[in-house]
Amino acid sequence: MSAFRNHCPHLDSVGEITKEDLIQKSQGTCQDCKVRGPNLWACLENRCSYVGCGESQVDHSTIHSQETKHYLTVNLTTLRVWCYACSKEVFLDRKLGTQPSLPHVRQPHQIQENSVQDFKIPSNTTLKTPLVAVFDDLDIEVDEEDELRARGLTGLKNIGNTCYMNAALQALSNCPPLTQFFLDCGGLARTDKKPAICKSYLKLMTELWHKSRPGSVVPTNLFQGIKTVNPTFRGYSQQDAQEFLRCLMDLLHEELKEQVMEVEDPQTITTEETMEEDKSQSDVDFQSCESCSNSDKAENENGSSCFSEDNNETTMLIQDDENNSEMSKDWQKEKMCNKINKVNSEGELDKDRDSISETVDLNNQETVKVQIHSRASEYITDVHSNDLSTPQILPSNESINPRLSASPPKSGNLWPGLAPPHKKAQSASPKRKKQHKKYRSVISDIFDGTIISSVQCLTCDRVSVTLETFQDLSLPIPGKEDLAKLHSSSHPTSIVKAGSCGEAYAPQGWIAFFMEYVKRFVVSCVPSWFWGPVVTLQDCLAAFFARDELKGDNMYSCEKCKKLRNGVKFCKVQKFPEILCIHLKRFRHELMFSTKISTHVSFPLEGLDLQPFLAKDSPAQIVTYDLLSVICHHGTASSGHYIAYCRNNLNNLWYEFDDQSVTEVSESTVQNAEAYVLFYRKSSEEAQKERRRISNLLNIMEPSLLQFYISRQWLNKFKTFAEPGPISNNDFLCIHGGVPPRKAGYIEDLVLMLPQNIWDNLYSRYGGGPAVNHLYICHTCQIEAEEIEKKKKNRRKTELEIFIRLNRAFQKEDSPATFYCISMQWFREWESFVKGKDGDPPGPIDNTKIAVTKCGSVMLRQGADSGQISEETWNFLQSIYGGGPEVILRPPVVHVDPDILQAEEKIEVETRSL
């Protein structure tokens, strides 16, 4: 054992253990509260057989350690060992069976004792041997037991007006790609970020899909975690199921996301090389996934305000280096559902050129502008339209990956120092390789799609093309007049009057609003055939993707003309997601009223064809979808009840999930439902055949001389995706081809071993890679990790010493002239960092929760969770982290009357004389 591993003095107390013993204990229960796993903890003290629950329950394992002074315990799910006395993870000699040795690597320097466990550099020089894939790992056939008594039919108890959450969770639970990830790759649900939503979701999925099939479970842990992050869901009022979905998916993405470094192809044209900074506010008004036909002049003129305050609706979180987020506001939901994520190919800019010319001819000398949004700034790429005839490759959609998420950042100034260089395009500049940061998670892999939208000025013919990532499509429900226009049109993308889709979404006065309210009430009381044809989901999609004339009060602010101009706006899908989430905009919220559109929308259970909405040059091959689940709302806008209809993937039957009640229903019942949110999954019989073929090959188990390591995450895609894409082993490899030191401790959770014949078949079919026959800890990454940790340690020490010195000086002041207030939430994050409890420094100072503006002045919010520091301390912290705003308290100055002061002095003199 190395000196580093021997640093824990309590390892000598470990008794003799075997892997079989731990497996047997993992199938048991906590000896105190009788709760089952996962994540039970077994005491490793010699001759102690105690097994207790962890933090997700009552944490009896910690209580046992405190009472008995037994410091070492092992997690029976991950087999990782924790020492309570040393407050860190420790590594045992291999007592659980022989493991292949790795080449010796330089041992890391000893790290500060109170440093957080996850940024300690794993010092074990061996890796656990990953399991060999067996038939069950790739088996897609349903067991006879599951056909007779299908799993996943467990209800969720209502814990106080939480039907919105229960319906959303059941709908997500019946999305096989996501659920199978947590069931088959549960070891990947690890995070240091609080409140660890991914761990709570893993526990919930394990309970819902357990073979014992309990009648119902209580999602308390998950609900408490979400309420901690998002105050919207606190209390007992009814909330929106779609907002909960977006919040949950965003939190899961944030906790599970991984940064991937990728080198561009040398022939690619990097967007950064042609970027020019453009602060025009009008450029923000492009396609929103809320509706292609929604544009607002006010938002054109006030684009810079799109990252501000409130948290009622959603906006996007484009990933870079940031972590946390909150929900956004109502009007942002209409315009900011998407931001640019990826740039696929310059040929994509040509995709709608022919259809554009139907309205007006393009001038070959004009410029097509591609606008790329990021959280730090805006990027504008100008491409001459005469280049559009020759498609050139821009960075692939794997290279630049700012990503749509469910919520905006905590504050506007959350990303200091993230403004990348803006360079003027050089026509003759040499192509060069370049690295881009990108993030991905199981959420983005499953739910992210891409839309290409264009706005053309009808005066100067300038076309602005925007590529946007969406996680769901919010579709308007067209009215009778809109349906007539859509159905009478011979072209599927013919122009529809701006704002006409769903007249309820246009600005209205009080009288118009009241008349519309009465009209809707009457409509809801009269059979739909009286009012016209039935609205279908295809109608809603057609209305969403319809061309939109920008004129009148809805004119387009042209950057070239520098004026408001008439324009035309349209969009198509460049990349469809594996699971398409569709939200029907049934609710409309005014200042004092809320209304609901109760129009029935007909939707198919199978064979939703999205070919008419696919971009011309899109590489997508599968555009047909089958319904997985649908969330329904019964009632009015102010009150009601949510339920979910879901198709069980094991027996293909439909069930109604109404809180803790689960009932089988017919397909006609589902089709007659008042759909609010729908989940569709790509349909591919070819993918099913390929999975059966590989499963049969694996069952044969031909002897092979070589074993190949493959990513568990990619195998999950192969089992559940219609288009799994190329094999990707980058989730367990570093850029040097080895295993990153941080992942060495749980490599068995990341990979499986395949026989050579299975690897050859998968590789020939899907490509990708790289092929891996040997696992080793990367020496280069280990050295880099040591250097990074050394710098962090020095930074912590410096910041802590300066703060203590400044704070002591502040405490000695008798009557300071000013106090600076600081958010205690941010301060606790900073304190955890400088004390070594958290591996990463906090973001910018965020005083928005403790500040309130009155009469133009920033004041301390009453009852705010804040602390007081000196001006020098504030300047010190602000110079490092930035942020704000400044919240200053000035003690009142007591003005003493001069006559009173003179009288007091006279009395004092007389007293002395006596």
UniProtKB/Swiss-Prot annotation:
Its EC number is 3.4.19.12. It catalyses: Thiol-dependent hydrolysis of ester, thioester, amide, peptide and isopeptide bonds formed by the C-terminal Gly of ubiquitin (a 76-residue protein attached to proteins as an intracellular targeting signal). Signal peptide: none annotated. One of its GO terms (biological process) is endocytosis. Ubiquitinated via a VHL-dependent pathway for proteasomal degradation. The UBP-type zinc finger binds 3 zinc ions. However, it does not bind ubiquitin, probably because the conserved Arg in position 55 is replaced by a Glu residue. Deubiquitinating enzyme involved in various processes such as centrosome duplication, cellular migration and beta-2 adrenergic receptor/ADRB2 recycling. Involved in regulation of centrosome duplication by mediating deubiquitination of CCP110 in S and G2/M phase, leading to stabilize CCP110 during the period which centrioles duplicate and elongate. Involved in cell migration via its interaction with intracellular domain of ROBO1, leading to regulate the Slit signaling. This is Ubiquitin carboxyl-terminal hydrolase 33. It comes from Pongo abelii. The lineage of its organism: Eukaryota, Metazoa, Chordata, Craniata, Vertebrata. The gene is USP33.
